[in-house]
A protein has these predicted regions:
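A short, exposed loop/beta-hairpin motif centered on an aromatic-Gly-Thr core
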Residues: 38-58
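Short N-terminal "domain-start" leader segments
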Residues: 1-33
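Short arginine-rich
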Residues: 60-75
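Generic alpha-helical secondary structure signal
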Residues: 27, 53, 63-66
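Conserved catalytic or regulatory cores that recognize and/or transform ribose-phosphate-containing ligands
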Residues: 35, 48, 63-65
Length: 75
């Protein structure tokens, strides 16, 4: 199994958002990915990034959007 490096994990309501660095079969870094996992078992890769800075910024923007959506639902 190839390693992955997780830079962030957040849980918002019934969803979890995770951003990780994935590696190729030869253990060379491949890409950063942000995934959303739902309690019902559904999951989806929502973004891919080239750099760690892009991954952090992208992850934070998804978290912000999910928080806004949740706050709108609760209002």
């Amino acid at each position: 199994m190839n390693p992955s490096v997780q830079i962030s994990l957040n849980r918002i309501g019934d969803r979890e958002i995770s951003t990780v660095l994935l590696y190729r079969f030869d253990n060379e870094p491949r890409a950063w990915e942000t995934c959303i996992f739902e309690d019902n078992g559904n999951s989806d890769v929502v973004a891919r990034y080239v750099t760690e800075a892009e991954a952090i910024a992208g992850h934070n923007s998804y978290v912000f959007a999910m928080l806004q959506e949740r706050n709108t639902q609760l209002a």
